[in-house]
């Protein structure tokens, strides 16, 4: 298909993966160390364009603290296992989603045959959240584990 017609007809692109959900019956909350927070921030911001001031790592940390923190501190979750989850620590599934809305600028890049890296950069600037980023937010919310997110999403 020619790039012009393809770009003109494309509205959105959706990717999704399923991850195992943490058992809510045995889920335990612990304080997150500064090192763990730094590693998660590194993982989350890995795909961000390096030369764009709109992507502020410190603002992201503050936002996470507001949305996911407990008593002014970031927390992490672990599940030792219980009778409700058959001692696995996991029960059910949750979806990770990546939705790329085709904006005017993305359409132009597709029509001119831009490389995948350029398309991803523009999609991130336009507000797309990657599978990994959606997964990390679900880790911070206590829905799934970082191991699950890493196993099902690429960097």
Segments and roles (model prediction):
Residues 1-155:
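Short, flexible helix-loop junctions that flank or precede catalytic/ligand sites
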């Amino acid at each position: 298909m020619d790039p012009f017609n393809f770009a003109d007809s494309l509205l959105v692109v959706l990717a999704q993966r399923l991850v195992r959900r943490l058992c809510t019956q045995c889920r335990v909350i612990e304080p997150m160390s500064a090192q763990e927070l730094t590693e998660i921030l590194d993982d989350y911001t890995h795909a961000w364009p390096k030369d764009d001031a709109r992507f502020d790592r410190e603002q992201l940390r503050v936002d996470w603290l507001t949305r996911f923190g407990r008593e002014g501190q970031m927390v992490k979750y672990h599940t030792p296992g219980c009778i409700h989850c058959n001692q696995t620590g996991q029960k059910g599934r949750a979806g990770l989603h990546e939705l790329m809305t085709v904006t005017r600028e993305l359409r132009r890049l597709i029509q001119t045959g831009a490389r995948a890296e350029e398309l991803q950069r523009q999609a991130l600037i336009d507000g797309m959240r990657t599978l990994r980023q959606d997964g990390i937010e679900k880790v911070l919310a206590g829905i799934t584990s970082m191991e699950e997110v890493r196993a099902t999403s690429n960097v």
